[in-house]
Design a protein with these regions (language model features):
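Conserved short histidine dyad/triad with adjacent acidic residue
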Residues: 67-85
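Glycine- and acidic-residue-biased ligand/ion/polar-headgroup-sensing regions
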Residues: 83-104
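Double-stranded beta-helix
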Residues: 103-106, 127, 131-157
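A short, N-terminal "cap"/entry segment at the start of jelly-roll beta-barrel domains
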Residues: 1-65, 112, 155-157
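Short acidic-glycine-tyrosine-enriched beta hairpin
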Residues: 102-125
């Protein structure tokens, strides 16, 4: 309980910085006006078709990115990595095989099966590919997405 009391005494800015460092953002920019809030609320959701399914970009701003991915059973994304982007994937529905490695060789990559309720962190530089074992909905929470930061090593669907 003492720890909670100490946290409650911290300044708002100190809490923002501490929380930001915990999630890798270095700080969180608060919404300072109703205009800021309306700007985020009014941004349209971007629909991006993919060979393996589709992405719905819920948010992609300077501080973070949030997407909903649908991957059709048996389909896969490319084996790729990002030099800037740090990602966490959460399986909302379905199941995937997640291949991951810091090496460029998919054949020697580790594999983990993720099912509903599972999550996995993919740090900057980690090569990764998902393959859907059944139709899957996957949330991606990450730092900002830049298309030029996707380095594809092996083609997906």
């Amino acid at each position: 309980m003492e720890e909670i009391g100490e946290i409650m005494k911290e300044s708002e800015e100190s809490l923002r910085q501490r929380l930001g460092s915990l999630i890798g953002l270095g700080g969180i920019r608060p919404v300072k006006s109703s205009g800021d809030a309306r700007m985020f609320a009014s941004d349209p959701i971007k629909f991006v078709p993919k060979g393996w399914g589709y992405e719905k970009w819920i948010a992609n701003c300077p501080e973070y990115c949030g997407k909903l991915l649908f991957i059709a059973k048996g389909r896969k994304c490319s084996f790729h990595y990002h030099e800037l982007k740090d990602e966490v994937f959460y399986v909302q529905k379905g199941a995937i095989e997640m291949y991951y490695s810091f090496q460029n060789n998919l054949e020697t990559a580790d594999m983990k099966i993720l099912v509903e309720g599972d999550k996995m962190h993919i740090p900057t530089g980690m090569r990764h590919q998902f393959v859907a074992l059944k139709d899957t909905e996957l949330f991606e929470f990450s730092t900002t997405h830049f298309e030029e930061d996707s380095y594809r090593l092996e083609k997906g669907d």
